Amino acid sequence: QSDDYGHMRF
């Protein structure tokens, strides 16, 4: 999966 820098990543 790609890192979506639009959602809060944990």
Curated annotation (Swiss-Prot):
Principal localisation: secreted
Record organism: Rhyparobia maderae (Madeira cockroach)
Keyword Ribonucleoprotein: no
Keywords in alphabetical order: Amidation, Hormone, Neuropeptide, Pyrrolidone carboxylic acid, Secreted, Sulfation
Family statement drawn from the similarity comment of this UniProt entry: Belongs to the gastrin/cholecystokinin family.
A Pfam family: Sulfakinin
Protein name (database record): Leucosulfakinin-2
Function of the molecule: Changes the frequency and amplitude of contractions of the cockroach hingut. Stimulates muscle contraction of hindgut.
Cellular compartment(s): Secreted
Secreted recorded as keyword: yes
Residues bearing PTM Sulfotyrosine: 5
A GO cellular component annotation in the UniProt record: extracellular region
